[in-house]
Curated annotation (Swiss-Prot):
Database matches in InterPro entries: AD, Lsm12-like, LSM12_ABD, LSM12_LSM, Sm
Domain annotation Sm: ranges: 3-70
Top-rank taxon: Eukaryota
PROSITE patterns, alphabetized: AD (PS52001), SM (PS52002)
The protein, known as: Protein LSM12 homolog B
Residue intervals of the AD domain: 81-175
Annotated Pfam families: AD, LSM12_LSM
UniProt xrefs under PANTHER family: LSM12 HOMOLOG
Entry-linked CDD domains: LSm12_N
Amino acid sequence: MAAPGPGEYFSVGSHVSCLTCLGQRLQGEVVAFDYPSKMLTLKCAPSSGKPNLSDVMLVNLAYVSEVDIITDRAETPPPLASLNFNKLVNRARAEKEDKLSLAYAVSAGVSVEGQQLFQTIHKTIKECKWQEKNIIVMDDVVISPPYQVDNCKGKEGSALSHVRKIVEKHFRDVESQISVQHSQQAQHTQDSALSS
């Protein structure tokens, strides 16, 4: 069965088995089914092997050669979980502020390094904003270009010390990533030369 015909659908909670066009056998519980797009969402056993997790697979039935219903839904599916709209609104507002902040930095001509440092600080300290090309943290610490530890200015105290530690760690991590990339490139070049 390639796809259900008109009026046919999969019940949420049913267990099905599908054979994809790539020969992969998928088996799981139906979480959702959209008839117009022929998309089936299955909750499958976890590929990680962790028992408290599940893999969620989206299956386009146009690319399935066979679908078997193993067990039909035995009872009424549980009601959908309620959504915390305040939490969703706050998350959307925070995402919007983050995107606007990034757009401001780009339009102000802030260097990529400055943008990356801002994002690193913002992960730890949400009270972080741009003032022209300067990063302002907790309204106490100003980091000006070129955004090094020596460019952190503010009242001596725990806030300045904490921000300096974040900046130091950020640049250590960046240096570490660069050295790993260089060693990988050198290894790749060496491997290419040996295979020639």
